[in-house]
């Protein structure tokens, strides 16, 4: 039985997002919106980095990085929960 495998993006966070989307997880929509907000933050930073004070730029960058890392970990865990639920559904076999 041939299966069309989804190619990796070579970015663990993006791959986890893709897995969550493909699994029709209800968390995908919320996490996707959060990812867009963080991306908008990076766009703001890149647009204004030459006119921001160095401390402000450093603190804002750290905050964005922390938010992105936290979100990627939440997405990773949500993917684990999907697999856990799939395994649970096999118990009666």
Language model features with spans:
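Compact alpha-helical subdomains of small soluble proteins
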Residues: 36-93
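Immediate post-signal-peptide N-terminus of mature secreted/exported proteins
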Residues: 1-26
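Surface-exposed patches in mature extracellular/periplasmic domains of secreted proteins
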Residues: 25-33, 79
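Charge-rich, solvent-exposed alpha-helical interaction surfaces
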Residues: 16-19, 34, 67
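Short, solvent-exposed segments of well-ordered alpha helices
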Residues: 4, 22, 29, 55, ...
């Amino acid at each position: 039985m041939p299966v069309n495998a989804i190619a990796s993006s070579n970015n663990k966070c993006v791959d986890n997002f893709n897995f969550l989307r493909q699994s029709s997880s209800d968390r995908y929509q919320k996490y996707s919106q959060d990812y867009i907000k963080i991306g908008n933050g990076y766009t703001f930073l890149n647009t204004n980095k030459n006119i921001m004070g160095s401390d402000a730029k450093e603190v804002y960058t750290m905050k964005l990085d922390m938010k992105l890392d936290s979100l990627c970990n939440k997405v990773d865990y949500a993917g684990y929960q999907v697999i856990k639920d799939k395994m649970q559904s096999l118990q009666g076999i």
